[in-house]
Amino acid sequence: MSAEILNAQHNDDTFENIWQELKWRGLVHVSTDEAALEKALSEEILTFYTGYDPTAASLHLGHLVQLLVMRRLQLAGHKPLGLVGGFTGLIGDPRQTSERVLNSPEVVAEWVKSLRAQIERFLSFEGENAARMVNNLDWSGQMSALQLLRDVGKHFRVGTMVKKEIVAKRLNSDEGISYTEFSYQILQGLDFLELNRRFGCTLQTGGSDQWGNLTSGTELIRKVEGKSVHAIGTPLITNSDGTKFGKSEGNAIWLNPQMCSPYAFYQFWLNTADADVVDRLKVFTFLTRAEIAEFAEKVEKEPFKREAQKTLAYLVTSLVHGTEATDQAVAASEALFGKGDFATLDEATLESVVAELPSAKLSEDRLDMISVLTELGFAKSNSEARRILKEGGASVNGVKVQGEDAAISKDDLLHGRFAMVRRGKKNQGAVELV
């Protein structure tokens, strides 16, 4: 995120306090004592933390919720600690379905660097409440088994641990749960304790599916330090039709542009259903409630204009990928719908567009339009392709082509590689020269 975008962000000052805004935006599913938490957030400057385990090379949309909660709390004056789990990432928190595959220390170390760089883009590291990055390998990695069992494990009761929701599900499954993953909640509890001791951290935020791990920390601090600390669990976001949010055709939407292009990212948000778009604006943008109310009215009265979706897609893609990449994604989207010029797109954006379309890799001697249309599946036979060309039903890079002898020339190839082909209004594809 650019400094310009970061500096332009602000909370909605029509709310009495940040707690009320978080609740209105639907960002609180569960918490420790609500009255005490609201009072602390309103009257004190809290140091808080959110943890991110390096179980992949990139964060995804589920993590984006946490990153934006961190930023909202920072804008309210509180001090963020971004924790990357260099130690817990070697263990893996228990999933509801099966045991995680353990990654090598070398892989985890690389992923720690990647995640740290992503997290840093969403926070300010300047001013009185500057963010700080921490790694739990710095304390857990130095602890002996004896220290862990005597100083930490002694405060955990197995009866309580097995009642944690995910642990209970795994215990009742055919696969069960390993001692390694069963112990994860002890390690996350230790993180909160260490951050409380080192930085005076009194609040942890995370997804509600991690609630058992979050409360492991609050309980440990109460037993060891005699203090009451806080935790907030954000809701797991689902679509109005009951499907899981954050997936596209079963694949996670990553924040790394190499794993999910800015164009594909933009398209994901642009395709948000009318029934979901207002809630997404609340969670993922810094628009005020008055501004969001205006979009809610537009969705109700003029849904066909999709203004809310366009705004959502632009703002969130800008947050994650910057305005330059977002402008390219918008230009690509407009070109696909005949409202723009593919020639204005940079090569990376054009590649990402081609990846989302039916495409064919053809040699120079196969660039005649009859071959192109049949290879793309836009014509079932050469005779059908001839008919399409005779009727002027095909275009290349937005320019209509006609005649059986029509072909894509080298001059037509964008960046010397690609030609965008359309048949009629709905069939859009691409050819790549090989």
Predicted regions and their residues:
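Short alpha-helical patches at coil-to-helix transitions and adjacent helical residues
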Residues: 63-67, 142, 213-214, 310, ...
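Short acidic loop-to-helix transition motifs that present clustered carboxylates
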Residues: 188, 213, 401
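Predominant activation on well-ordered alpha-helical scaffold segments within soluble catalytic domains
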Residues: 116, 184-187, 193-196, 215-218, ...
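Conserved nucleotide- and phosphate/pyrophosphate-binding catalytic cores
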Residues: 223-434
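NTP-dependent nucleotidyl-transfer catalytic core
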Residues: 1-210, 218, 225-230, 243
